[in-house]
């Protein structure tokens, strides 16, 4: 026999009873693993098994307890008649209708094909599998009382004044309370929920001890978990507080630094007007084609200087024209100019020249000294005459140290060796030439003005060919002379005179002596 054979949840029973009170009735059964509640009115396999066990227990009761069989018809009719006598006329019809439905339900619950022998055989098999009579006796009593109360109380449904299914459920609960038998089990009825009953009757003491130990261990593990969670929460809270304090300290430090910066800026602005400005002309150097010199001298040589820049921090360098500013302007001009550094003579007062004392050449001055390395290379240097005798008249009578003039090139033999109006020369000696003056000097100075507008020509109108007895060996000397073109070669060969020693060259510093390697070859320009 299965639950389907009973068919207690048939269409007639479900339509005759309201659906909402059903979970309340099933919730009172003992032994249900997952008892349905008001929010979950569904039937689970565990609930169905519990219901089957309950029905099995009810089949073992005595026949006088009615079980699944309806009571005799006559007493029920008499009871109904008695109730009709006490009730009103409107309740009679409703009472008869409910009685008919109850009898139909009883017929559907107890079909004629099932017999007590089949119920007994099914009960024997269930007895061997599970011994749960004592555990579920209270539930069985409740179920039996529910069946009896339902069948016995529906006959008096007319007392409710025609309220129908709701009054029937109230009568069922009232009948269940009146007909409840005493429970045969010592285990109290469960209040619902939970995985297992509080104590099983068939559990041995060893199993109970193991269960107790397991529960204690689980409690300790849960307590440790809670403690660990609390400790971790406290640590995170402390860390957050520490970070907040650190952020506040950083904000205060930033505010202090900003205040200090504002004060320093205010002091700087207040002190700036009192600072003395550096003179602009102290750091400015005028250049012309890579040469450094005073502005007056460079302007005489028709080389305009650019506008001066007053930038004390940056060093501007212009090799062609302009102004170099900065402390290292001379070094920048020397290293970055297009042409090598060349120091030119500057105008010197004539009265100052008269007070300069002639000193003999220092023979210990070697080529490695700093004075020897300054200035132009040897082939660009020239010796200056005796400063004390610059203004003396030229001629054999006024000369005390007449040099032995070297033989000029045969192409320049007709040129005079002096330049008139020597007093008009404004170019004086340089520092290097003053330091390297020979001991014996001539009393004449014949050379062209480097920055003069016109060449100083002699009376005959020809260019000079010698300076202090040293022949001029540059191509520009014979550029505009026909004899030099005819006698000096084809214009593609170097034009130079023979190297004839004289007094001037013998008394020169060894580094200033002309040698074939000191002067580069010069070509005549046509």
Swiss-Prot record:
The modification Phosphoserine is found at residue 339. Residues 78-87, 133-153, 301-322 have a biased composition (Low complexity). InterPro entries: AP-1 (IPR000837), bZIP (IPR004827), bZIP_sf (IPR046347). It is found in: Nucleus. GO terms for molecular function: DNA binding; DNA-binding transcription factor activity, RNA polymerase II-specific; RNA polymerase II cis-regulatory region sequence-specific DNA binding. PROSITE patterns: BZIP, BZIP_BASIC. GO terms for biological process: embryo development ending in birth or egg hatching. Residues 154-165 have a biased composition (Gly residues). SUPFAM superfamilies: Leucine zipper domain. Transmembrane segments: none annotated. PANTHER family: ACTIVATING TRANSCRIPTION FACTOR 3-RELATED, FOS TRANSCRIPTION FACTOR-RELATED. This is Transcription factor kayak. It comes from Drosophila persimilis (Fruit fly). The gene is kay.
